[in-house]
């Protein structure tokens, strides 16, 4: 009831925000505001809502697809939650130069998972692309992937992919700050491809799927496939079923993490959740460890959370000593892999 009352009170602010975003988009559509065109093909992966949609695993999948196709790739991201400002080189395609505190947890994870990929963070994505073009003029990538850039229209893109969370259709009901929409839903018509992410067998996403198809854009369904349970010392868990866990995370949509654990056959006996991108404190880690010890549980978290914690050696060591694990994930596309791959390759033919 409290949240509903707050949403009602915030409706005037949401209406004003929606008008501002609509005007801004109109000015770009009419060419009054200009978008810079990169000489290197650009693929953007973004959201129309705040919160977790499965965007980061999709970026990782796209980079790995290009790499498997023999296409050198670079990532340019805002680096949400980082303590640095301006343009920063996270990875030169050979060395990881910044951790999660200076690059942002999602960006640091993407760089670590794709060690041959150049990764740059920049609030102004145009400056980030221009920096890498100058810095790596002798080995330019064949394609640049923009992470979280659907609303960042100062840079043009050759393929605009938007991810929508199938598990939370209510997220597209209202504009910020009353809801989670970053811009009016009609903005989806600007996308070239829509990914309905995080579908599950029990998710009631038929209505949302129909709404997305009414944009006239291709819609591909995606689900998160749980991977391996990795001990934070780097070793793999022999079997998921033998682990009784305390699941903890500080992400936008923790229910997706819990679903992945259950799908992987991992028993969840207790949970602890923190705010998305919030730095872990010593007291938070001690509370996790204390609860796990009291109940005889193994702490398990997301790969993104572990990258955030690993930047704090003392906290990381505390979790190593109690056998903490993290779960890897990857997206899969039940009926749209070929369409996604076709569009990604068509970008290179421009």
Swiss-Prot record:
NCBIfam families: lpxK. GO terms for molecular function: ATP binding; tetraacyldisaccharide 4'-kinase activity. Keywords: ATP-binding, Kinase, Lipid A biosynthesis, Lipid biosynthesis, Lipid metabolism, Nucleotide-binding, Transferase. One of its GO terms (biological process) is lipopolysaccharide core region biosynthetic process. Belongs to the LpxK family. It comes from the Bacteria. ATP binds at residues 49-56. This is Tetraacyldisaccharide 4'-kinase. The keyword ATP-binding applies. GO terms for cellular component: plasma membrane. Signal peptide: none annotated. Pathway: Glycolipid biosynthesis; lipid IV(A) biosynthesis; lipid IV(A) from (3R)-3-hydroxytetradecanoyl-[acyl-carrier-protein] and UDP-N-acetyl-alpha-D-glucosamine: step 6/6. Its EC number is 2.7.1.130. It is an enzyme of class 2 (transferase). Transfers the gamma-phosphate of ATP to the 4'-position of a tetraacyldisaccharide 1-phosphate intermediate (termed DS-1-P) to form tetraacyldisaccharide 1,4'-bis-phosphate (lipid IVA). Transmembrane segments: none annotated. InterPro entries: LpxK (IPR003758), P-loop_NTPase (IPR027417). It catalyses: a lipid A disaccharide + ATP = a lipid IVA + ADP + H(+). Pfam families: LpxK.
């Amino acid at each position: 009831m409290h949240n509903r009352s707050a949403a009602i009170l915030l409706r005037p602010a949401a209406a004003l925000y929606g008008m501002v975003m609509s005007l801004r988009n109109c000015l770009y559509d009419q060419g009054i505001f200009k978008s810079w065109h990169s000489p290197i093909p650009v693929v953007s992966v973004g959201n129309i809502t705040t919160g977790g949609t499965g965007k980061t695993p999709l970026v990782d999948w796209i980079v790995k697809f290009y790499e498997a196709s023999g296409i050198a790739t670079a990532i340019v991201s805002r680096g949400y939650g980082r303590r640095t400002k301006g343009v920063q080189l996270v990875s030169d395609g050979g060395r990881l130069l910044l951790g999660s505190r200076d690059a942002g947890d999602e960006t640091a994870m993407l760089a670590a998972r794709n060690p041959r990929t150049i990764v740059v963070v920049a609030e102004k994505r145009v400056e980030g692309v221009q920096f890498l073009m100058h810095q790596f003029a002798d080995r330019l990538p064949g394609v640049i992937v923009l992470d979280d850039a659907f609303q960042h229209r100062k840079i043009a893109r050759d393929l605009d992919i938007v991810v929508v969370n199938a598990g939370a259709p209510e997220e597209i009901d209202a504009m910020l700050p009353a809801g989670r929409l970053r811009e009016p839903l009609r903005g989806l018509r600007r996308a070239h491809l829509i990914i309905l992410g995080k579908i599950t067998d029990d998710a009631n996403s038929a209505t949302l799927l129909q709404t997305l198809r009414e944009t006239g854009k291709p819609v591909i369904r995606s689900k998160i496939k749980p991977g391996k349970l990795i001990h934070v010392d780097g070793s793999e868990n022999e079997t998921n079923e033998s682990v009784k866990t305390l699941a903890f995370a500080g992400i936008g949509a923790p229910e997706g993490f819990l679903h992945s654990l259950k799908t992987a056959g991992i028993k969840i006996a207790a949970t602890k959740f923190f705010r998305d991108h919030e730095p872990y404190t010593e007291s938070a880690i001690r509370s996790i460890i204390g609860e796990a010890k009291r109940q005889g549980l193994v702490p398990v978290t997301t790969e993104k959370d572990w990258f955030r914690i690993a930047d704090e050696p003392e906290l990381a060591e505390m979790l190593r000593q109690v056998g903490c694990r993290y779960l890897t994930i990857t997206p899969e596309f039940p009926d749209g892999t070929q369409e996604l791959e076709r569009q990604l390759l068509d970008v290179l033919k421009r």
